[in-house]
Amino acid sequence: MSESDPQIKVDWQARRRKMARAGLKRMVSLVERRDTERADGPLPLHKGVYIDPARFEAERTKLFLGEPILAGLSGDIPNPGDLFVFDAAGPSIIVTRGKDGAARAFLNMCTHRGAKLVEESEPFSDHRARITCPFHAWTFDPAGKLIGQPSKASFAGCEIGARNLIERPCAEYLGLIFVRPGGGDPIDAAAHIGDFSDVLAALELHRAEPVKKGIMTADSNWKFALDTYAEGYHFASLHASTIGQTNYSDVSAVDRYGRHHRVGFPDFGVGDLVSVAENEWPETEYGGVHYIFPNTVVFFGSVGVDSFFTQVFRLFPDGVGKTRCQFAVYAPFGVGTDEYKAMCEMAYDATAQVVQTEDYRVASHGYANLLTAPDDYHVVIGSNENAVQAVHQHIAEAIGMPLN
């Protein structure tokens, strides 16, 4: 058992502040040097990385069906009988909380004649002590067991247990609920997260309470949209009236943890500390962008003094050139007051406006241009776009296809 287990008594606020101070030291140095943490050099990517249908199919099957995919947080199903729909990866799946406290995932399909048990789409959630099919009223408990079957005699000789819901691998770890949508081996979530566990544990995601959810879309390949979360090179130009007003452009501190990473983007207040002795620096709260392979970004930040929020972006392909982002904001340590809830909702609305109208706008335009670019055209990911390079390298490795 390690400190990353939320049951271990740890002062997580102190841990976050320790992480914040370590990150601050690096960012003060970067701002002083007017530099950023870099890869060894630029990385050219053939346009096919974004537009090739064969590559997209490999990503769909090997990543979105075969890898552990974040379906939600523990707080999305806090009580036995709670459930939510997870259908963005392809198959319609329901994730439930059983009486034993375990999270489970099942195909959203009645084992009688295949009807949908829950007809709503993601991000729908509900409390149902019993899950009843709208077609013929077959009924299941949250553990997937068939417990109700009208005209039961009509199915004499049919093994009841064989008609329990069809389960998909599911694992809950550090407040994260992972599902392998295409089925297959059980999920070892601790192994999947690896060395990133201690960082994610400090976010106390098991305490996060959902505040607002929605969907953002882009007429772009999902990776083109994902790229914008991993670099701050564009802040001064694309976000000139928003984050460009508060944060340095093209300055970032990057930590890689296997296939995952964390990026810190310094605000202008960091520059004020360049000429100040470290022992005179004020206490700093933790914040950062956390990427969980292959498609999830978790941002931890604040909306005021001692008022934090967690934003989760989960990007999914609806086609080679169609992206759907399931976006949610959480109160990291519970909602508490109506005022705090309103602040979290405001953070959701402001972020959605910027991402949809700025980041996803240029992603859509860029993707359209790649479709008509010369056959030998390559985009280039700069050495200053360190984390973007890592994302593409790990995706290419996972699907077994070279980048060029």
Language-model segments: what does each one mean?
Residues V49, P53-A54, R60, S74-G75, ...:
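Solvent-exposed, flexible loop/coil residues
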Residues L24-P53, S121-P134, N164-E172, S241-S275:
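N-terminal short leaders/motifs
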Residues A71-N79, E159, Y286-Y291, A328:
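Short linear motifs in intrinsically disordered
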Residues L65-I77, Q149-A153, F293-V297:
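Short Pro/Gly-enriched beta-strand edge/turn motifs at strand-loop
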Residues S2-S121, C170-E172:
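N-terminal pre-ligand scaffold of iron-sulfur
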Residues E59, M109-C110, T132, A225, ...:
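Short hydrophobic core segments
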Residues D76-G183, I187-G194:
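Rieske [2Fe-2S] iron-sulfur-binding domain
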